[in-house]
Amino acid sequence: MIDYVGSFLGAYFLGFALFYGIGFFKSISNRII
């Protein structure tokens, strides 16, 4: 159960970090251009 919850939180955090990173990269690229 702990491993399942840990993997779920890890995947959720990774997806959130990826989404936030893409939005941050888009904002920087738009600001430069």
Swiss-Prot record:
May initiate with G7P the virion concomitant assembly-budding process, by interacting with the packaging signal of the viral genome. The assembly-budding takes place at the host inner membrane. In turn, G7P and G9P are present at the end of the filamentous virion that emerges first from the bacterial host. Belongs to the inovirus G9P protein family. The chain crosses the membrane at residues 5-25. It is found in: Virion; Host membrane. This is Tail virion protein G9P. The gene is IX. Its main location: virion. Keywords: Host membrane, Membrane, Transmembrane, Transmembrane helix, Virion. Disulfide bonds: none annotated. GO terms for cellular component: host cell membrane; membrane; virion component. It is a single-pass membrane protein.
